Amino acid sequence: ISTMHKSKGLEWDRVYLMSVNNYDFPSGREYDRYISESWFLRDHLNLEAEALAQLEILQSTGDYDWYDEGRASQSARMDYVSERLRLLYVGITRAKRDLIITWNGGRDGGMRPAESLSALIGYWEEQMNEFGGEG
């Protein structure tokens, strides 16, 4: 057993990727949720990113620098989405023969399969239809 982080450069005959949903692997869509954001905060702001952005503006000497609430949260989301997509790629490419990917609906049932997983499933189904064979 290994994490995706520690598996880079390694391969196994069978790989299991768990919880590939829009919380653990968000795509940047409006309905995605993020670990760094709390549901009870207005506009689901990432407080750490917003605080750092405010500190940068305070230290800035430019006349045209200003704090735009929410921009830092959006930037942090996109950074997180990129990092998680790279990590998912690492996980997928560790499989030599078998790749098993699962997702869950979360505690409240509001989670969906990750958009990247849905795209992969669509691609796989196209290939099966085009070339035949079992999935």
Task: Name what the model sees in each region.
Residues 2-94, 98-105:
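Conserved helicase C-terminal RecA-like lobe
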Residues 107-135:
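Long, charged, helix-prone linker segments
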